[in-house]
Each structure stands twice: as C-alpha cells, then as structure tokens.
Regions:
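Acidic, low-complexity cytosolic segments
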Residues: 1-176, 182, 188-194, 206-212, ...
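Intrinsically disordered, low-complexity Ser/Thr/Pro/Gly-rich interaction regions
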Residues: 132, 142-415
Length: 415
C-alpha cells in the first residue's frame, strides 16, 4: 500500500525517508513542494504524479508525504499519517525537525513496527510502548554503552488481548481521569457584523491513569448538539447510537476520545466582535481604527488575542498607536500584526492611526480582512456540558475533572 514515507521541513527539505516495498526517489516530493509553493495554506491532500500518488498531511512545522503506487483509500492513509505524528508526540513530547533528528533510531524502530510491508500493523500507543520503550536519559546512556536498542524482546500482552489499546497490569497510586473539551470556531463575519458562515470543530482529549481494567461511561447534558462524530476505537458505537452515551474501556495515558463537528449557525455563538473603520482616499493618507471586545463569553476572559491584516498593495507604512499590546508591519508582505494579549472589558483594546500610501495611486484594492486568533478558558462556545462520569469494574474512587477551552480556528472579519 504505502511504498515510502518522506518527512519534509518548513523549508522544503526532506530530512527523513523510510521505504518499505521499494525505494522511491525523493525527487517525487517536488510535486508536493510545487503545490505547497502555489498554495501554502491549501495543499491538496492527494497529488497524482506520473508513477505515484502522493498523500500528504501537514502538522505544525513538518509535512508527511506518503508515496503509493496503486490507488488506495486516501482517508485510510491520512489517518495513518496522523497516527504517526501523534505517536511521535506521545514518545518525544513534540514532532519537530530537531526532535525527530535527535531520536532517529527510535523513529525508525517505530516506523518498522507501525507498518509491515506497507500495511499498518501496530498503531496503538500502548502496544508500541511495550514493543519499543520510550527514550529517556538513563536508557539512552545504557543503550550507548551496551549497544542494545529500545526494542523489547517479549511480545506485548495487548497484542493478544481482546482490548489491544490497553496494556495489562496497570497500577497507579493515585487514580485519575481528566477530560479536555476543546472547540475551534471557524467563522466569517461580514462588514456589518453579521455572521456569513460559522461552524465548530471540537474534540475531547483525555488523560486516564486508572488501575486495573475500568469500564467508563461519560454522559453529556446536551448530546444532540453533535452533527458529526468520530470516535477512538475503544468507544462502543452501538451504545452511542442507542443512548447517546460514551461507553468505553480507556487506553492508558493520553488519547483523543472523540472528535465532533457542529455546523448549525444558530448554535455557534460568536465570542468576540470587532469595530473597525478603514478608509483611504486616492493620493492621500488613510485612517485605520480597530477595537476588539468580548461577546457571549459568560464572563470568561478572552486571552492570547492576535489580529492580522493583509493591507492593500498601495500601502507603504502604518503609523499606529495601540492602547494595549504591540504591532508590527511588514512592508514587503503588507501584513499588519497586532499582538493584543488579554482583553480587559474595562478598557477595550484599540489601535488607531494613519496609513501612508503610494503617491498618485488611483486604483485602491479591496478593503482588508482581519484574521483573528484567541483563546477562552473554561468555556465551550457550543454550550456543550459533560454531565457525569461513571466507572464500573473497579472498586476505588478516582479523581475526576473536566476543562473547557474555546479557540479560534479560521476566524475572519471582513472590513
């Protein structure tokens, strides 16, 4: 299925390649790099070349490119590539070029176990950790001295179990189960402040450290909100269809329990607003005035706010005064960035000033749009609430907790 895998950095350099069925020249990545240069934020997930199909995934600062000789289900390969990145993050804490280069040996060992002759084999983190021990300082020193590797000499118990995602014999002094409900808001707001488009991409991440073989049931106050869901294999889907409950025997450690999508604009409460005034008169200086404030946040603080505007090509410079945060203007890309930070409702962040344009300009480009980033802790903008968590099969009482986070996805305000 997958012949080769290439990992490409942000500069377009292939810094790792792995071949299973046949050696594919890294020159095939030029098709991917051409597509990336043409549309950096909209690279096609599947690229057809004369001899191979390239299936790509971009995560943070690296891109994974899988080369397949025959037609394959693209989503199958895309899901596998995401599993590869998730496994690297679980093992090393990050999936960046420097981290991968520092752990080349373990990376190749993992890829050998995760794919067998081009077909996915072991992708569950708990099984992989029994096969290949995560690196640490003492183990690295010992392996250097003895010449051994991180590969285990025994077959993992989970491989023969009916529950392959959970290893046997798990024991903790403190038993705890924590859930993070994270929602990303994708929205387009028009010039008058009306919502043109809005949807929510959400997911529930878990940190489960429970002894034995617990059987958990998670219920929601309003489960009918979900338009589309995707579950970890541990979730009993028939129970969800019948009762709208998440019933599962959890993996040990960190994992993503479910992803969901909410597309009804009536449910998506836009958590911020922007008052704006941008005007340019032909051949003269223009004015810019922006104010950002919270809305529908239930008193929660809006944090990590950042605004980015791509100004018209005729703009030479911006002389602005923010009452909060700092701004920068790149005269080459015509990008204005304003790092606001936290919004104080008693004094709303504002930036205003003059904009100088090329003398004699007669044709003014369209007004810019504002791309917004933000975070709101302890708020699920959809109104989703976890009702309760019940545990069966074990007699102890675990510590339980739920955190909510709303943040901007592709959030754009037109001016």
């Amino acid at each position: 299925m997958i012949h080769s895998l290439f990992i490409v950095n942000s500069g377009g350099e292939v810094f790792l390649e792995k071949h299973w069925r046949s050696v594919v020249s890294r020159s095939v990545c030029e098709y991917f790099l051409d597509a990336q240069r043409a549309a950096p934020y909209d690279v096609p997930p599947v690229i057809a070349t004369p001899h191979y199909y390239l299936i790509t995934v971009q995560r943070d600062t690296v891109s994974l490119v899988a080369a397949c000789k025959q037609e394959v289900p693209p989503l199958f390969v895309i899901e596998f590539l995401h599993r590869v990145v998730d496994t690297f993050q679980d093992y090393f804490g990050d999936c960046s070029e420097s981290v991968i280069k520092d752990n080349y040996v373990v990376v190749y060992e993992l890829l050998d176990e995760m794919l067998d002759n081009g077909f996915p084999l072991a992708t569950e983190s708990n099984i992989l950790k029994e096969l290949i021990k995560p690196p640490n300082i003492l183990r690295t020193i010992a392996n250097t001295v003895t010449g051994k590797s991180n590969v285990s000499t025994t077959l993992p118990s989970g491989q023969l179990s009916a529950i392959p995602w959970r290893r046997s014999g798990v024991r903790y002094t403190n038993n705890e189960a924590y859930f993070d409900v994270i929602e990303e808001v994708d929205a387009i707001i028009d010039k008058s402040g009306s919502t043109v488009f809005a949807e929510i991409q959400g997911y529930i991440d878990c940190c489960i450290k429970l002894s034995g073989m617990p059987d958990l049931t998670l219920s929601f106050m309003n489960p009918r909100l979900f338009d589309d869901v995707s579950f970890h294999p541990c979730v009993r889907f028939k129970r969800w269809e019948a009762e709208r409950l998440l019933s599962f025997i959890p993996p040990d450690g960190n994992f993503r329990l479910m992803s969901y999508h909410i597309s009804s604009q009536s449910v998506v409460a836009i958590p911020i607003y922007i008052r704006h005034n941008f005007s340019i008169k032909t051949g003269e200086q223009g004015r810019l005035d922006l104010t950002i404030g919270p809305r529908n946040t239930l008193g929660r603080t809006v944090d990590k706010v950042k605004l980015e505007l791509t100004m018209p090509r005729c703009v030479l410079n911006c002389l602005l005064t923010p009452n909060q945060g700092k701004y920068t203007f790149d005269s080459v890309s015509k990008t204005l960035s304003w790092d606001v930070g936290r919004i104080d409702v008693s004094k709303l962040p504002n930036i205003r000033g003059s904009v100088s344009i090329t003398p004699g300009t007669t044709n003014i480009d369209a007004n810019p749009s504002v791309n917004v980033q933000f975070q709101i802790s302890q708020l699920a903008v959809s109104g989703l609430k976890v009702n309760r968590l019940d545990m069966y099969g074990e007699k102890y009482k675990p510590f339980k907790g739920v955190k909510y986070l709303t943040k901007a996805g592709k959030f754009q305000v037109r001016m």
